[in-house]
A protein has these predicted regions:
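Coil-to-beta-strand transition motifs
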Residues: 43, 54-57, 97-99, 227, ...
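C-terminal edge-of-domain segments
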Residues: 1-3, 120-275
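A generic structural motif
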Residues: 36-40, 85, 233-235
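An N-terminal domain-cap segment
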Residues: 2-73
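Short, structured beta-strand-loop surface elements
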Residues: 64-128, 240-243
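Short, surface-exposed beta-edge/turn micro-motifs
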Residues: 30-33, 54-56, 77-79, 134-137, ...
Length: 275
């Protein structure tokens, strides 16, 4: 994603790899995107986003008679704010998992040949294939990216946040993992969260400021799942905690998140599951 020509004078604090992965996922196409031309005060809320083959942030929009591009209809580079919002995996939770925010410059592709050179994948590629030349596709250049998640705020420079799609875990595998996690009994999810809190399984816990009266009556719910681990919302004694449970084998070339999740369930310590 492009890419400041100079590095910042003061290096940014390091960020946990799982948060880096979350920011990458959102920018690669997860969640919903809003693109605002902040000088004109206009916002595209029906755009889709993803990345090019070389890791640049791409947005696409289909103008129509009811929702034209307005201030976005310009061949000149446009100053924009991009917001990507991602809800919790369990949609019964009134909780947003994370959001990514950036200021940058949007430049629309001039023709279909320039779009083809981007090497698009995912939802943006599907939209271009389905709608054809009516789709406006643009590339967003930025220097810094802000991530808001359950751990707080993290700031990334683009050169530390590679977005190329090469080497990604198969999306069907991750969809199956999400289904498996959502299909796991809340009591079992609670056992996993408690095992992390007791130091019996690898992971991290972060207290949350959430009104537990607004949450479902469940000891634990799924906030997120990816190749690195599963993030759970644990509610106990009127307090809520986000617990990231690391998946065994994450980072290995033969890593299967779905199989790792099953191994993790088998590894729940007996003293947690059967006190």
């Amino acid at each position: 994603m492009a890419h400041a020509s100079t590095h910042p004078a003061h290096p940014l604090p390091p960020v946990a790899p799982r948060r880096l992965l979350l920011a990458q996922r959102l920018l690669r196409g997860e969640g919903s995107v809003e693109v605002t031309a902040f000088r004109a005060g206009e916002t595209l809320t029906t755009a889709v986003h993803g990345v090019s083959a070389d890791g640049r942030l791409v947005v696409a929009h289909v103008p129509n008679l009811l929702g034209s591009l307005g201030a976005f209809h310009t061949p000149a580079p446009l100053d924009v704010r991009v917001d990507v919002l991602r809800d919790a995996l369990d949609l019964t939770l009134p909780t947003r998992l994370a959001s990514v925010h950036l200021l940058g410059t949007l430049r629309w592709c001039r023709d279909s040949a320039e779009v083809a050179e981007l090497g698009l994948r995912g939802r943006v590629a599907d939209l271009v294939a389905d709608v054809g030349p009516r789709v406006r596709v643009g590339v967003v250049e930025t220097q810094r990216i802000l991530l808001h998640d359950v751990d707080g705020v993290a700031v990334f420079c683009c050169h530390t946040l590679p977005l190329t799609s090469r080497g990604l875990v198969d999306q069907a595998e991750l969809a199956d993992l999400a289904d498996d996690v959502l299909g796991t009994a809340p009591e079992v999810l609670a056992d996993l969260a408690d095992a992390v809190a007791l130091g019996l399984l690898p992971g991290e816990s972060t207290p949350l400021q959430v009104d537990t009266e607004l949450l479902p009556e469940s000891p634990a719910n799924a906030l997120d799942a990816d190749e690195a681990g599963v993030t759970l919302l644990r509610v106990r004694d009127g307090e809520s905690t986000a617990v990231h449970v690391a998946l065994p084998g994450a980072g290995r070339l033969d890593h299967s998140p779905r199989h790792a999740w099953r191994r993790l369930l088998d590894a729940i310590p007996a003293r947690v599951a059967h006190p």
